[in-house]
Curated annotation (Swiss-Prot):
This is EMBRYO SURROUNDING FACTOR 1-like protein 8. It comes from Arabidopsis thaliana. Disulfide bonds join C38-C54, C43-C74, C52-C70, C55-C63. Expressed in flowers. Residues 1-22 form the signal peptide. Keywords: Disulfide bond, Signal.
Amino acid sequence: MSSSQFFILCIILISSFPLHECENGKSVEASNAAKTLCMSVNCDNKDRNLTCACCLAKSKNRCYSSKSECVADCKD
């Protein structure tokens, strides 16, 4: 590996560090307020009007009949 390739690799690694710092959302307070906890999805393929709210948290993969139930459980 030439020195110029090594230099470019170092720049890429150093520039990706701030992105990793903000990944969890705890380092920047504004990102916590804008974070969406639940996503509306279609619950039944036969009935397109039947929607559920599914939790987007990594540890919880549950869906609820209402968005308020989903938000209440996903906050924990």
